[in-house]
Design a protein with these regions (language model features):
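Helix-coil boundary/capping segments in enzymes
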Residues: 1-194
Length: 194
């Protein structure tokens, strides 16, 4: 069985800012190796290098997969903001292969309520967070209630804990050791690092 655990549903201009597209284009011009199936790596138009992953492109790129986890990043700090209803609607139309996960910005005052809505109302089954894209310190105790809620809901969490082409993204929040406090405080929270 082939499972793709990390796919995105988002496209320009609906979910990405012009600034994000400029950063993506600069990364491409710097010879960053991207998948031409989803990310238009060979295209010279900067707006085609926006990391577009439309429903059609996602279906085509994952055709050989038995199961696919898909999410739409909620990271307005760096210029990406995907409505979680978009992911839920897409998954409802492709339940045979796709598993929808949500993304919540831990900086939002109502992030715990957003997570509950995404899981209990929309039916999304995991949480995607990205400190470098969302500009949050995983060690800050103010974020712990979100991960306690994910643990209580018994959903897995995937972390983008690596570098990025997005210039405003603080690399200091991408160090995996920063997740230790959450792991200790939430011993039953399943965490994956991407």
């Amino acid at each position: 069985m082939l499972v793709d655990i990390h796919t995105n549903l988002m496209w320009y201009p609906d979910h990405m800012s012009d600034e994000f597209v400029e950063f993506a284009y600069a990364a491409k011009r710097a010879k960053m190796r991207l998948s031409p199936d989803v990310y238009y790596a060979a295209h010279e138009d900067k707006y085609k290098n926006a990391f577009d992953s439309t429903p059609e492109a996602l279906l085509e790129a994952t055709a050989s997969c038995d199961k696919v986890v898909v999410f739409g990043l909620k990271a307005p700090y760096c210029g990406v903001d995907v409505p979680q209803e978009l992911v839920a609607d897409f998954v409802r139309g492709h339940q045979d292969r796709f598993i929808g996960w949500c993304s919540v910005d831990p900086n939002d005052a109502d992030c715990v309520e957003q997570l509950e809505y995404n899981v209990n109302t929309l039916g999304l089954r995991g949480l995607k967070v990205a400190p470098i894209y969302q500009n949050f310190d995983p060690q800050n105790p103010k974020h712990l209630p979100l991960f306690k809620k994910a643990e209580a809901l018994d959903i897995p969490t995937i972390w983008h804990q690596g570098t990025s082409f997005v210039r405003p993204g603080p690399l200091k929040w991408a160090n995996p050791i920063l997740l230790e406090d959450i792991a200790l405080a939430c011993p039953n929270l399943r965490m994956m690092i991407a």
